[in-house]
């Protein structure tokens, strides 16, 4: 996804996400060849070693092809490798149990979470109970 990098504590993500995504979308509007039909917003979380530290987050949008960084926007990829995944349907504010379910699955299956996770936000709908978000956690090898 194209991205605008920012760092935040978990409770502050909403405050920094929208301004960052606005910059990415403005960039994509002037670079039509990068736009992908159905390109969704993606949040890529870089988990700090110390849970009390701010988390680096890449806020981005799925694009049609790689590109060279320009205008403060970089092209990154979600990590390669095995990942635990779930599909959450409902209000963004109530997504936490879906994350907890992945953590529980990892414990029950003796799997360790790697250093990154990401969320892919589905198509917008006014009915927040129909919002779809795919949640991925990179698994440690």
Label for each model-derived stretch:
Residues 1-141:
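A solvent-exposed interaction/effector surface
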């Amino acid at each position: 996804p194209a991205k605008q990098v920012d760092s935040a504590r978990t409770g502050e993500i909403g405050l920094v996400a929208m301004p960052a995504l606005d910059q990415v979308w403005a960039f994509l509007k002037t670079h039509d060849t990068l736009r992908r039909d159905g390109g969704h917003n993606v949040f890529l979380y870089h988990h700090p070693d110390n849970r009390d530290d701010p988390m680096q987050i890449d806020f981005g949008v799925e694009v049609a092809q790689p590109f060279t960084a320009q205008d403060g926007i970089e092209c990154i990829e979600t990590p390669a490798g095995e990942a635990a995944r779930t599909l959450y349907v409902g209000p963004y504010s109530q997504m936490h149990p879906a994350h907890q379910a992945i953590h529980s699955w990892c414990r029950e299956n003796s799997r360790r979470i790697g250093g990154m996770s990401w969320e892919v936000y589905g198509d917008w709908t006014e009915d927040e109970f129909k919002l779809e978000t795919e949640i991925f956690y990179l698994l440690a090898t």
